[in-house]
Amino acid sequence: MPNITGGAGEILVVMDQFNWDNSAGEMLQDILKEELPGLPQSEPLFDVIQITAASFDSFYKFHRSIVMTSIDSNLEPRVRFRENIWAKPQIMVQLEAPSSSALHTLIRENEARIQSFLVQYDRDRLMATYLDSKDPAIQKELSAHHQVRLAIPRGYNLDFSKDEYSSVSIEA
């Protein structure tokens, strides 16, 4: 299976323009662009890219995080959380509904589940990346002096380490 494309914190939403510009799309945008708490400046949870189903081709199929909406009168409302459909490690939230109003209701009723799934999976992937690139020497030193286990990425320098405190920096 191919590797994912797209950056950390980036969500690809596949939704027709009419719904994107109306209540279902606005609600989905509110969920995905909610302000991150605790930062000194306003930052959204995710950077959101919206495309239509007609534009969703082999280039976009490998995106790391996809929210795909489908509206068809033959569909029952449902949310599916899927992994590794076209690439690895990929996630997808599928939202299916028989109408625009049913899609809006489906999004509203599953707001917390949708956001939690996307946030947790993105966080887990980011942590795995840092764990894969950690500097074991700095980790060992910090553990010995402070009884704490931190995954410090390679490229950082341990300026000094004492029993009371340590200093780690990176040259920009």
Where are these regions (language model features)?
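N-terminal targeting sequences that direct proteins away from the cytosol to non-cytosolic compartments
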Residues: M1-A172
